[in-house]
Amino acid sequence: MIPVQGLRGATVAVLGLGRTGMSAARALRAGGALPLCWDDNPDARARAQQEGFTCTQLSRVADFDDIACLIVSPGIPHLYPAPNPVVRLALQAGVPVDNDIGLFFRSFATNAWANFDTAPRVVAVTGSNGKSTTSALIHHILEHVGRPATLAGNIGRGVLDIDPPHDGEVVVLELSSYQTDLARSLTPDVAVFTNLSEDHLDRHGGMGGYFAAKRRLFAEGGPDRAIVGVDEDEGLFLAGQLAEGRADDRVIRISFAQKLTGPGWQVFARKGFLSEYRKGKQIASVDLRSVPGLPGVHNHQNACAAYAVCRSLGLAPKVIEAALHSFQGLPHRSQLVGQKDGVRFVNDSKATNADAAAKALAAFPSIRWICGGLEKDGGMDALRNASASVVKAYVIGREAAAFAMKLPVEAEICTTMAQAVEKAAREAEAGDVVLLAPAAASFDQYDNFEQRGDDFMQEVAKYL
């Protein structure tokens, strides 16, 4: 655990007592603060009280008179579509609102670092798609070369649950827009922006607010090194804003769609090969086609981002290349479940928006596509030019009929995962891929995308 610094003796309100909220409450108490907790769920309050925390509902502005700050869990709205009532009261009372990420950055560095040979560093990864794979890949490469590393944030452990860093350790954080939007302190040493597509728009008031939330990771003077995907206008703009000039190699531009040129530092993937250029000269080339854990061009972008981070941390190209080949990938992300009679079954349940699904569809030549669920803001436009490889779609979800009508391919309404897998497997021919890439949220039928992916794998197991 990382004890929270700078709040000893202060009363700190904690709103939301799930994994993140309880982690913050424990870290606050370990640092000498006095957590005052609340959750609308009585079971969550009971669990907190069993750990000795005081639970009190804050229902008036006057209730905040003696409170130093309010810590909010990421699932609780603080602005859009409307602030949670407790958040609104805190703002009216002039009480700062923060989250566990802000507490982490204010508490990460300690006096113990004076005895370290190499100061610990923080790598933070954000973006719409590819955050988890990029973060896990960075962590894997560092572990492969024997460098101490910890994976936390939106993946792995909570940021305040990790141990205080060791000499030379690298902490890799995956950060969502919910986390970057609210954190009062964001000071990573290396920051990564993978890409941007329409997602979570209700929580950010539109694309402008969504991009602004991601961009906050690069504020406060900026990180020592910024790795920025430039295949969308927002990334191109961000890289231009951060760089002092064309040759400023504090910004590493990455792409999986174009060859990058210029005197700066670039890493891009074309036709399955990753290339690194610096000051106009090629430094290295890596064949990504034979890396089993990174199928598809969308994963080549993740490889470019992870490669750029590790190069900025001083690792040699050949060392990084060797580590790429031992990466197994993540569950529910282009995950090969099995194969029978020449038909492959791939679980990409994490493809929860149209852009992510479009990238998954681009990875395979002949697809039996299982999709559907709760459609997200932003619509289905990204799928219009990505369906050439789809033989047929099998649509699940409570609103399967409406979802199917928006697809640019032949679609059959299946409603349940069991029906979809059974029909897709029965109709598939050798060379086909039965792909779960929902292009939608899971909450109409499942608790989360992991449960949806597990259901797919269980149904596939019956067929194999």
Swiss-Prot record:
The answer to keyword Cell wall biogenesis/degradation applying to this record is yes
Catalytic reactions on record = UDP-N-acetyl-alpha-D-muramoyl-L-alanine + D-glutamate + ATP = UDP-N-acetyl-alpha-D-muramoyl-L-alanyl-D-glutamate + ADP + phosphate + H(+)
Where it sits in the cell: the answer is: Cytoplasm
Give the UniProt keywords, A-Z: ATP-binding, Cell cycle, Cell division, Cell shape, Cell wall biogenesis/degradation, Cytoplasm, Ligase, Nucleotide-binding, Peptidoglycan synthesis
| GO terms classed as biological process | cell division; cell wall organization; peptidoglycan biosynthetic process; regulation of cell shape
EC number(s) recorded for this UniProt protein: 6.3.2.9
Q: Which domain of life is it from?
A: Bacteria
Specify where it is mainly localized: cytoplasm
Q: In which pathway does it act?
A: Cell wall biogenesis; peptidoglycan biosynthesis
Give Gene Ontology CC terms: cytoplasm
Give the residues the record marks as binding ATP: G127, S128, N129, G130, K131, S132, T133
Q: InterPro entries, alphabetically?
A: Mur-like_cat_sf, Mur_ligase_C, Mur_ligase_C_dom_sf, Mur_ligase_cen, MurD
What does the record give under GO molecular function?
ATP binding; UDP-N-acetylmuramoylalanine-D-glutamate ligase activity
SUPFAM superfamilies registered for this protein in UniProt: MurCD N-terminal domain, MurD-like peptide ligases, catalytic domain, MurD-like peptide ligases, peptide-binding domain
Q: Which family is this protein grouped under?
A: Belongs to the MurCDEF family.
Q: Which PANTHER family does the entry mention?
A: UDP-N-ACETYLMURAMOYLALANINE--D-GLUTAMATE LIGASE (PTHR43692:SF1)
Query: What function does the entry list?
Result: Cell wall formation. Catalyzes the addition of glutamate to the nucleotide precursor UDP-N-acetylmuramoyl-L-alanine (UMA).
Protein name in UniProt: UDP-N-acetylmuramoylalanine--D-glutamate ligase
Which organism encodes this protein?
Answer: Roseobacter denitrificans (strain ATCC 33942 / OCh 114)
Taxonomic path = Bacteria, Pseudomonadati, Pseudomonadota, Alphaproteobacteria, Rhodobacterales
Gene responsible for this protein:
murD
